[in-house]
């Protein structure tokens, strides 16, 4: 009995969480799904880990010691004629009459050396590399934000299209209820001889037309919902009920720069750091080395020729044909190009914001006008409904006014959706 109760309780809990997951289909759910399933965003996030690994590699190269094993075995073959007969020798140590390299200048040898090298002036280079790696990480994070931001806008716009279809479906359903109610009234009038059969037929035609619109809106909702799932990487083909969305206007924060200009700041820093990295070759380089091993020319008594040595290697570029000067000029020209791009981007962004605010003001005016028209249509339809009940107005007149009201209602639904799209655009640019 206890096992049965436990099984039943677990099923109830599972159904609760399943239903909760299916009902939590807000815009936030779709945006987060789109971010999680975007391969480009995942790639940008991996770049941060790649830069950290690269920084550790550079740290090892500039500051840590290095141990290397090197070796070579040199053969000097000759054709010897000593003793009156020719003989091929792979690695002659001595000969008088022979063909081949002069053995006094070149002879066989065997070298095997283990070398330990420690950079002594690598901290400056590592600091520059550390700054470059940090900047690359910041650039990867900024690219992630720059990819997420338009993705949020695309998901929001697609979500609003689905809500428009849903609103059209709901309104068409309400129109069907009105037509059914009037059909019931007119049918009684026809039965009592106060109305004509043609009036009832007109209402039947209007009902069929409205059902066709309802089917079209449901199909549009399914199509737009599948596009939304495709955009977000959601493997689901079932229709779900999306909650209503009212986008808030995100007003600008004073003295806070736009994140759109962040990429130009990072590009400018990247040029400066690249120039510093280039100038590292003009810094002096000093390395300490210690090696030990075997070096022999004559293999007889080779075991006595193990040894070791130590020293310093130094290098410093004094003159490079004015390459450094030309590199600095390139950096100045690149900085100028970045400033030009930044100013143009900021100009376009400000114009987009002003355009959105102007459109929002006009949409508010148009919505007030449409609301007044709808209120007038509702008054007329209310009066026509009373007169239709007693047969004082024709069904054709009633249907004509009803169609005008339906079209005005749809115009208002479209206007509200367009207004939400403008708010989404404003929030996108005001970032």
Feature names for model-found ranges:
Residues 20, 25-27, 62, 74-84, ...:
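Acidic, low-complexity, intrinsically disordered peripheral segments
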Residues 4-13:
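Sec-dependent N-terminal signal peptides
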Residues 43-58, 147, 151-170, 224, ...:
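Amphipathic alpha-helical coiled-coil segments
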Residues 25, 29, 144-259, 359, ...:
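Periplasmic alpha-helical coiled-coil/stalk elements that build and connect Gram-negative outer-membrane
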Residues 80-103:
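Flexible, solvent-exposed loop segments that connect beta-strands
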Residues 9, 17-78, 194-196, 229-274, ...:
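Bacterial Sec-pathway N-terminal export signals of envelope proteins
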């Amino acid at each position: 009995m206890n096992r049965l109760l436990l099984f039943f309780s677990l099923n109830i809990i599972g159904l609760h969480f399943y239903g909760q997951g299916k009902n939590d289909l807000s815009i936030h759910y779709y945006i987060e799904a789109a971010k999680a399933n975007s391969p480009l965003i995942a790639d940008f996030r991996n770049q941060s880990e790649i830069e950290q690994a690269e920084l550790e590699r550079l740290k090892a190269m500039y500051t840590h010691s290095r141990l290397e094993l090197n070796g070579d075995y040199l053969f000097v073959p000759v054709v010897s004629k000593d003793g009156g007969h020719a003989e091929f020798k792979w690695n002659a140590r001595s000969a008088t009459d022979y063909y081949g390299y002069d053995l006094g200048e070149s002879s066989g040898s065997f070298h095997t050396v283990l070398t330990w090298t420690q950079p002594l002036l690598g901290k400056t280079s590592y600091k520059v590399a550390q700054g470059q790696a940090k900047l690359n990480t910041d650039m990867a994070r900024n690219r992630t934000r720059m990819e997420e931001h338009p993705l949020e806008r695309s998901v929001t716009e697609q979500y609003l299209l689905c809500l428009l279809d849903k609103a059209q479906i709901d309104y068409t359903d309400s129109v069907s209820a009105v037509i059914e109610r009037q059909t019931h009234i007119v049918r009684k009038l026809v039965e009592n001889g106060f109305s004509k059969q043609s009036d009832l037929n007109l209402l039947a035609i209007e009902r069929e037309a409205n059902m066709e619109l309802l089917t079209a809106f449901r199909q549009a909702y399914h199509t737009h919902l599948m596009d939304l799932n495709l955009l977000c990487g959601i493997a689901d083909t079932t229709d779900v009920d999306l909650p209503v969305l009212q986008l808030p206007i995100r007003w600008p924060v004073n003295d806070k720069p736009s994140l759109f200009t962040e990429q130009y700041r990072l590009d400018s820093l990247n040029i400066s750091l690249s120039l510093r990295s280039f100038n590292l070759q003009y810094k002096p380089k000093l390395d300490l080395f210690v090696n030990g091993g075997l070096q022999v020319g004559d293999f007889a008594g080779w075991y006595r020729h193990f040894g070791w040595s130590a020293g310093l290697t130094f290098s410093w570029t004094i003159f490079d044909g004015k390459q450094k000067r030309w590199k600095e000029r390139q950096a100045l020209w690149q900085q100028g190009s970045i400033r030009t791009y930044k100013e143009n981007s900021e100009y376009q962004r400000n114009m987009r914001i002003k355009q959105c605010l102007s459109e929002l003001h006009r949409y508010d005016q148009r919505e007030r006008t449409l609301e007044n028209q709808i209120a007038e249509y509702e008054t007329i339809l209310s009066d026509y409904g009373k007169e239709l009940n007693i047969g004082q107005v024709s069904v054709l007149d009633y249907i004509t006014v009803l169609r005008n009201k339906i079209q005005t209602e749809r115009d208002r639904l479209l206007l509200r959706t367009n207004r939400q799209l403008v708010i989404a655009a404003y929030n996108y640019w005001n970032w």
